[in-house]
């Protein structure tokens, strides 16, 4: 049986078990295949599944996100609902032995690095820092995202006490982007998962 915990957080370890040993990747892939249909039925994207072992304890950590065409965050109510459903699926999995496990279901927090095209789609309209390969790093607001890259409206630093100016939109191809990170803005703190850069609200199911 499981102890299921629903969280919205960018902290991928969740319980602080930093010394837990990650289970061999094929097992995580098997669990992913087992859980993915249920996640998709909730119109969500299964971002990641990881399994960690610390002594006799196991932690199954599932990260779900909205589809890339949507903005905002996954609500805590949805996280709690799908957590209970996934717990039932794992409890009925004949491949799992009788050892107890903790199931943690979360959505990515604002601190998630932007490393894949879908991450950039999800961050449309947000202020981001872009780590550029062989070029000067940029800060600006994402105007649009397509198959080739990201169009950014750069933020130009101004004198102290003055608002930054906006530059002309600039297209950055994905092959020039190492990664990026969303900048926290006070106007977005009411969105799910943005209360804190590393830990959002949590609920134990």
Curated annotation (Swiss-Prot):
GO terms for cellular component: cytosol. Residues 18-27 have a biased composition (Basic and acidic residues). Transmembrane segments: none annotated. GO terms for biological process: ribosomal small subunit assembly; translation. Residues 1-13 have a biased composition (Polar residues). HAMAP family: RimP (MF_01077). PANTHER family: RIBOSOME MATURATION FACTOR RIMP. Belongs to the RimP family. This is Ribosome maturation factor RimP. It comes from Arthrobacter sp. (strain FB24).
């Amino acid at each position: 049986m499981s102890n299921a915990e629903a969280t919205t957080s960018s902290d991928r370890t969740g319980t602080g078990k930093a010394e837990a040993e990650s289970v061999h990747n094929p097992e995580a892939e098997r669990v992913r295949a087992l859980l993915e249909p249920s996640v998709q039925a909730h119109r969500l994207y299964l971002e990641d599944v990881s399994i960690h072992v610390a002594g006799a304890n196991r932690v199954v950590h599932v990260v779900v996100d909205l589809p890339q065409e949507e903005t905002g965050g996954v609500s805590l109510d949805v996280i709690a609902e799908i957590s209970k459903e996934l717990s039932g699926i794992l409890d009925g999995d004949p491949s799992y032995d009788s050892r107890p496990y903790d199931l943690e279901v979360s959505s990515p927090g604002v601190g998630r690095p932007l490393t894949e095209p879908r991450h950039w789609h999800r961050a449309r309209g947000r202020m981001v820092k872009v780590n550029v390969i062989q070029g000067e790093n940029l800060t600006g607001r994402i105007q649009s995202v397509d198959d080739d890259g990201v169009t950014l409206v750069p933020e130009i630093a101004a004198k102290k006490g003055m608002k930054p100016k906006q530059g002309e939109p600039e297209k950055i191809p994905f092959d020039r982007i190492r990664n990026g990170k969303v900048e926290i803005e006070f106007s977005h703190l009411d969105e799910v998962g943005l209360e804190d850069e590393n830990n959002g609200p949590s609920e134990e199911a």
